[in-house]
Amino acid sequence: NTFGFRAEKPAFEALMYRMVDGIDGQQLPKGSGTRMVSTITDFRSAALEETGRKQDYAIVGDGFFALYDPDTGEISYTRDGSFALSSFQQTKEDGTTDTLYYLADGEGRQVLDTNGYPIVVTDAEARQPVGVFTIQYLDGLQHVGSGRFVTTEKNGAVWMSPSEVRQGYLESSNVDLASEMGKVIEAQRTYSY
């Protein structure tokens, strides 16, 4: 039930069997049938849950929120819109400091607005201009943990998405728990004697 979590499905390939010499010259098959070669992420939308929190956002349709890591400069993408306010002390020319508040994820990565800049929050109750971005090719997005993905050269262009954003909602996981449990039981039966 992790908000914004995307299901992953394994991709298998068949292995060729080959014969190897056994004891007394007997031919024995060697191989295990199949092996997992990759996982395919399911980016389909899931149900929205109302939270009432002003810093929660959900995407209706396709697209991703963009997160900027101020420590590394990395931009990552997520469907998890459970954001919070993150403070930053800025020193002015006269030596005094101002506290700026950014809309950020739980790790301090700043949410980007519709122009691709970190969102500075001046009114915590107001709707923020949260950007939603479309990635040309979803195949090849690199999963970096916590429901976040980074683009690679294979992904092509990234642009603003026309998808609607709802404040006070979060998108649930798109994993069908009943289906997944059925697959676990099916896999266990495959290997039982």
PLM feature segments, named:
Residues 1-99, 104-193:
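Amphipathic alpha-helical polymerization modules
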